């Protein structure tokens, strides 16, 4: 992990959460250079918290979901970002690539804001309306329109760029959008698992962490993206569980559902605490699993012992287990 030499400056950007000075123009050709020059935040793969991990394992056991995870039917990543420069991660099957239905629409969202920032597309009122419909209502027609406008290869290049690394073959994949959300031909399936719309919980969590720390395009774009992720119109999975059992939670989310595949992802804020939760399931009961799971994850974040770890020494944090080797080509 690189030294965090400019963390104070980065924190000021995070806390401001608003417009900053004139941004350096970032084009596709300069993404890697921008990543090298950007403030260095902790890497999530180096931030596993053994207390949070033990708690997650216990919650899955109590919910009867540990065996589902062992069989690869459930994958979860939880990140406590209450103190954003000290993220703490717990996960099960974090790097398992799964079909994610509409969840990868967040990749189209990123692509649109990046392309507008690069001066290659206008972020006008119509575009913002389509993006909001794509995220809040999970509109397939809006997603297809925006994917075709931004460009399939552009989105894929952004996801695989050195700046974002949200799809990395060495990390067993990640976010992938290789087909329109319509009855149209596949553009390109993901190189490892042949999925049209795929994700791993860990890379989805990284997407949200990058957003929370002002690193998706720029601070202004991050703020606008968060607005679009807020006020979800579909009230199932994470939203259902939190609305019933943890009212007052601010939820910024994107979910996905198709057949037996259920996925949800969110930034959740309440009472001064903030966390990222991502869960993906392949089971007819997966939607119910996720509604119950989010309440258990919320309990972990608000557990007094977890709160006590906010500013403890780093001896409770360790590198995550490396992802499985990608399948042979």
Language-model segments: which ranges?
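Structured C-terminal helix/loop/strand segments within mature extracytoplasmic catalytic/sensor domains
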Residues: 23-60, 206-207, 212-329
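Short, well-structured active-site flanking segments
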Residues: 114-132, 218-221
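Flexible glycine/proline-enriched surface loops and loop-helix/loop-strand junctions
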Residues: 90-94, 137-142, 184-192
């Amino acid at each position: 992990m690189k030294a965090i030499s400019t963390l104070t400056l980065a924190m000021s950007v995070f806390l401001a959460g608003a417009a900053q000075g004139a941004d350096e123009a970032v084009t596709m050709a300069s993404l890697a250079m921008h990543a090298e020059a950007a403030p260095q935040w902790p890497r999530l793969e180096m931030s596993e918290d053994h207390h949070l991990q033990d708690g997650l394992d216990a919650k899955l056991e109590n919910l009867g979901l540990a065996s589902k995870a062992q069989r690869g039917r459930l994958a979860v990543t939880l990140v406590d970002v209450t103190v954003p420069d000290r993220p703490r991660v717990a996960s099960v099957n974090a790097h398992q690539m799964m079909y994610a239905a509409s969840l990868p629409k967040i990749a189209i969202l990123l692509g649109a804001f990046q392309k507008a920032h690069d001066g290659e597309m206008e972020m006008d009122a119509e575009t913002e309306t389509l993006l909001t419909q794509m995220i809040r209502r999970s509109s397939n027609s809006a997603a297809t329109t925006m994917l075709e406008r931004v460009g399939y290869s552009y989105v894929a290049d952004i996801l695989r760029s050195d700046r974002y690394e949200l799809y990395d073959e060495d990390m067993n994949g990640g976010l992938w959008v290789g087909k329109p959300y319509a009855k149209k031909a596949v553009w390109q399936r993901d190189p490892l698992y042949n999925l049209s719309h795929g994700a791993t919980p860990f890379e989805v969590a990284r997407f949200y962490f990058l957003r929370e720390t002002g690193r998706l395009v720029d601070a202004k774009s991050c703020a606008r993206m968060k607005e679009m992720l807020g006020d979800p119109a579909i009230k199932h999975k994470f939203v259902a569980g939190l609305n019933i059992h943890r009212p007052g939670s601010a939820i910024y989310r994107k979910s996905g559902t198709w057949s037996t595949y259920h996925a949800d992802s969110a930034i959740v804020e309440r009472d001064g605490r903030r966390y990222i939760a991502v869960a993906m399931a392949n089971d007819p009961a997966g939607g119910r699993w996720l509604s119950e799971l989010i309440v258990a994850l919320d309990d972990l974040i608000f557990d007094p012992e977890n709160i006590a770890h906010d500013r403890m020494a780093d001896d409770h944090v360790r590198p995550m287990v490396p992802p499985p080797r990608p399948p042979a080509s």
